[in-house]
Each structure stands twice: as C-alpha cells, then as structure tokens.
C-alpha cells in the first residue's frame, strides 16, 4: 500500500463532534434509503466473497441474477474448487473480466486445500485471508466486515469519494492517510451497517463522474464539512 506522497499535507485531525455527526447522518440516511440486495441477507463468507468479486467493475443490476445462479451451481467452496474451469467461465458469462472467475476459483481451491476439517472455510483473520490467491486488501477486509461484522475499515474508490467529499478533504489523499481516516470514523460495533451506508450513499447520492466533474451530489451540500486544523 502506498504511503503519503512527498510534500503532501498531513491528515487533518477530525473533531469528535464531526465524526459523531457524520456517523449519525450517514447511518440515519441509510436506515431510510438503503438498498435491499440479496447478498445483504447472508453472513456466509463464501457468498459474501462471490458478491464482492462479482461487484468489481460490474453493475449491481447485472450481478443480482448471476449471483443467484452462481450459488445454485456452486453452493459451497468445495463445489467451485472441483468444477472444471470451462464450466466456471461459462457460468461467469455476462459479467465480463473473466480473470475474476479464475481468481475466485483459485481462491476456493486454496481454501479447500488448507481446510483442517471436513468442511472448507475461509479464514477469519486479515493476514490469513491475504495469503489466499486473488484476495487484495479491500476484498479481504470486506469479507471481515460483511461476513463477521469485524471493526475494520474496507476502503475502495466509492468509500474514498464519500469520506473525502463529506469531510471537505482532498480526494487525492495517500492510501495510508485514507486508511487512517476510514478507521478514525468507523463506528465500532456497527461496521457492517456503516460500510453498506457508505456504499449506498456513494451509489445513490454522491455519484461518480458526471457532467465533467469528479462527482456530483443529487441533493444539497455535504452532510458534514467541519475539519479542525492539523495536530501540532
């Protein structure tokens, strides 16, 4: 992970009241406006993994039917690991970027090989997850969040956009500072809800590129825009 770039300003210190306000507003917005998506009704790590890999670079509307069909064809890690690659790729058709299907199958195969019991399972710690093929820092953290509600921060481009915009910070924060920011505003005990709120807010309100600008809100001004000066 890249750190702070040379000559980059230090990350401002957020006032506690700002953090609490951001958490309350985003979670309140989510409780009233959150999307109902099938992978949000499960805590099965394998199903969560399938959804996370499918959602990379593919629209939600295209993923939903494929997600259901995939879990019918390969309901367990063992089923996917044992499936011929050509069958897996056929099941993936329509989602694009076939390397994701290969990575998903490789990950399942590795989990099965390292299983200590009769049933394969994905690890529950970040270091162990990162040792599996095809899992990067975001996907590994997302598994811990959505399957186990662990208090870790999972940062992707949408989370970057929401946090930096809503807190009035530079969108070009270095990866180290961005991770520190995400951890600083994480409401402990509500990690899963918080990350879903960030994702839905980024998808429905603070949209990605539109009309030649980096992002565009569909309503008003930022939820919170109060950042203190840097710590001495």
Give the residues covered by each predicted segment.
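Catalytic cores of DNA base-excision repair glycosylases
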Residues: 10-18, 24-231
């Amino acid at each position: 992970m890249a750190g702070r770039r040379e000559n980059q300003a230090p990350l401002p210190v957020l006032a506690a009241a700002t953090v609490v306000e951001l958490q309350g507003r985003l979670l309140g917005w989510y409780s009233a406006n959150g999307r109902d998506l099938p992978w949000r009704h499960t805590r099965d790590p394998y199903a969560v993994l399938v959804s996370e890999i499918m959602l990379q670079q593919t629209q939600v509307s295209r993923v939903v039917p494929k997600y259901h069909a995939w879990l019918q064809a390969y309901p367990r890690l063992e089923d996917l690991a044992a499936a011929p690659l050509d069958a897996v790729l056929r099941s993936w058709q329509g989602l694009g970027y076939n390397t994701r299907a290969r990575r998903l199958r490789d990950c399942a195969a590795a989990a099965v090989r390292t299983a200590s019991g009769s049933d394969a399972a994905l690890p529950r710690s970040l270091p162990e997850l990162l040792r599996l093929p095809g899992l990067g820092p975001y996907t590994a953290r997302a598994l811990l969040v959505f399957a186990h509600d662990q208090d870790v921060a999972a940062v992707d481009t949408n989370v970057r956009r929401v946090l930096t915009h809503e807190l009035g910070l530079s969108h070009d924060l270095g990866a180290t500072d961005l991770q520190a920011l995400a951890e600083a505003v994480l409401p402990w005990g509500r990690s899963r809800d918080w990350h879903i709120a960030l994702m839905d807010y980024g998808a429905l309100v603070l949209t990605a590129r539109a009309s030649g600008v980096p992002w565009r809100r569909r309503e008003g001004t930022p939820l919170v825009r109060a950042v203190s000066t840097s710590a001495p």
